[in-house]
Each structure stands twice: as structure tokens, then as C-alpha cells.
């Protein structure tokens, strides 16, 4: 089967969050038995240099604000084809210092127009799998009435809060037909279109990244026209739980760890916890923390409203009052949050038990996973979440809000701790206190939580099998 994965992120090349990880992991799992090609836009200032074999390179035309030229360069990478599309005559759109900017609907619609032109020139494509609203226009462009044939289109919602509202005139720049454009337009305001809305109507099947989040989406009334769109397609909509790549996230082989360990040590809990402790010592030395403070809780997250930054701040107070260590590693995406957390970071530089790191440093993050006893994920909503899956893989017990994919993967008393209420901090503090108390006073119970998490299948094989089932059902 020829499968194309279209996205604006793919680890390890271009990544801002979990989207890039999922696109890479799913593609790699599918490529074992199928011909998988990943389409990415070229970001001149961001794309890393790499020496993979070039399979093909050619120039082609696409329509967006007139006739434009693009170059498709295809590489062989880990059994897959990675095709990077450079918008030669509109290169300034992607010459940015960050993946996402204020002009994303324009930039990514131009990429979608180029991707559609590229796909239409290929000999045979069975499935085009589009990831999130960024490539929503691609669904409509691949369903144009004048096309002699078109592949089956799968669209995955990674975060329903981001939808791609834009001007209808902007989408018209792709020369999409009036019929196609109508799928994107809002009835209440035809001058406004929504990339997500059009993708819902123009795709053969729609998925999201966990079963619980699928229900959250069906119960979301924040925009009644988007709600009508998803309800009209609910018979071809489901949640498929994300997974992680066990080869990438593996404490037995991770070079960033001071000491490696794995599930084979579950037969010798004392040895396992000694190795976790050695990683903790290495991290404490690196960050200047005092070894007197234990357990170690971490937060590894984008610091945005969705992720519960107010709970992250509350955790700092709880750690101070209860004498355990806390490391927060994350990136802020707005100036006010950046200001607040920078002030906190500066005020805690001499703290013996708390550190805030406002940067994503992959080796450091991996060491944190290996050193931490617990990982806190206080999200207001969470489509799936990958950090809890990685944490469990590294023997780090998840403390989560029971929502979306977190509810699907973390069960209180089985492999972690949960809280529900977000109107105050009482439920959250109760969860933290329960986790710290269990660690300190009930080592046998704590080991059972760690064991359950480390033995949990990553879900990557299952995820790929579910998607293959969807693909096959459409062919």
C-alpha cells in the first residue's frame, strides 16, 4: 500500500511537540510492510542538515496567489521516503525562526496547495493521511470534481482547540473550486473559512488521538458549525490511542542517562531503584540541587494554558511545604507566561529543591525522565499526551488530571495518581500529597505502580494496526 503522511512537523527534523513524534512513529511502524512517504515543508532557517541518500529531486508548479514553483526533494530515511517541499517562489513564508507564526493559515495553505500538486503527479497513491488543521486545505484540493481520480483521505485531529480560522479569500488563492470552498466557509459568515471544518467534510475518515478525546470533541459546542460538521461525520470518526517508539524512548539504551536500566531489573527492585537514584544524583549535581530532598517530581511540558500553568505554580508551593524536589522543564509560547515563569526561575536559582528550565534540551529532558520518581501532568484537557507514556517507560509514575488520553492511559492506584477538579487546588494537592506519602511510606505499593507502568505496552504497534484497519476499510 502506498501511504502518504502530510504534516508540518516530523521528529527529529522539525518538532514543536507531540505532533512531530506521532507522525514519525506512526510512519516508521507502517513502513515495515508498506510504502510510506512523509511530506514536509522546508523551513530554511530551521531544517537540520542531514546526509541521507537523495532519491529524487524535481521542480513542479502549483497554484497559490498565482502560478508558483516548488522543488520536491526525496530522501531515504529509516525505511521511509521523506519528501521535503521547498516553495521556491514563496520561500519567505517559511523563512522564520520558529515553526509557528501569526501567519500560519497563509503559510500552511500555500504548502497544502504545493503538496496537492505534488501528490496529483504521482503514479499511484492509496491513502493520504493528513495531520491537524495545518494541512486541512489539502483534503479539499484532493477532492476536486475535475480530478480523474483521487486517493482516500484520512484526517487526524491532534488538538481540537486549534482550527485554522482564516479569510475565505485566502483559501481561494489556491484556485479551489467554489464547491470545494463551500466546505470550509462558515454559514454565519461566508467571508470566513475554517481549515478544520473543510477537512472534516472532505475526508473519507476522521480520527483523533484517544477514545476519550473523541468523546470530548463530540461534546464540544464552542462553535456550533464545527460541532455540526463533526456530528455529521461521526459515523466515520473514532479515537485511536497514540503510542511511543520504544526504540527511541528506552532506558536500557538511552545515551543521555548516567546509568541505564530496564524491565529486566523488575525482578530486583533494589537494583532498579539504585540505578534510578544514580541518575537522580547526576541530575541534582547538574542542576545544583540538594540530595536531601526526595522524591523528585518533574513537569515536562509546553507551558501554555491547556497544560495548567497555574497548577505548575501550585506544585512549587507544595514542594516547598513538603520538602521534596521539583524540576519544571518547558517552553513558554506567550510573553506574559514567559515573564511569569522567568521571574519564578530567577527567584528559585538558589533553591535547594526546585529548578525551572525554560528550554527544551533533549539530553537533559531524557535525564530528567530517568531520574524522576514521578511526572506531573495537570492538563485542563489532553488529546492524548505522550509524556505520561514516556514516564511510565522510564519507571516514573504519572500524576495526571483525568481527561482525554490521560484518562485512557493512567488509572489511579494501578499505574499512577489522578485528580479531576480544576476549580480550586484542593483535589490537586490531595493527589500530590497521596503520591509523596506513598513513595515515602509504602515502598511495596510504589514498586507495583512502577512495575505496572514499565510493563505497559507502548501502544505503537496497536496504533499502527488500528490505522491500517481504517485504511483497508476504505480501499
UniProtKB/Swiss-Prot annotation:
Keywords per UniProt: Glycogen biosynthesis, Glycosyltransferase, Transferase
UniProt entry tagged with the keyword Acyltransferase: no
Catalytic function, reaction form: [(1->4)-alpha-D-glucosyl](n) + ADP-alpha-D-glucose = [(1->4)-alpha-D-glucosyl](n+1) + ADP + H(+)
Residues annotated to bind ADP-alpha-D-glucose: 15
GO BP terms in the entry: glycogen biosynthetic process
Highest taxon of source: Bacteria
EC number: 2.4.1.21
One annotated GO molecular function: alpha-1,4-glucan glucosyltransferase (UDP-glucose donor) activity
One Pfam assignment: Glycos_transf_1
HAMAP family hit by this protein: Glycogen_synth
PANTHER family for the chain: GLYCOGEN SYNTHASE 2-RELATED, PTHR46083
Functional note: Synthesizes alpha-1,4-glucan chains using ADP-glucose.
Protein name as it appears in the record: Glycogen synthase
Designated gene of the protein: glgA
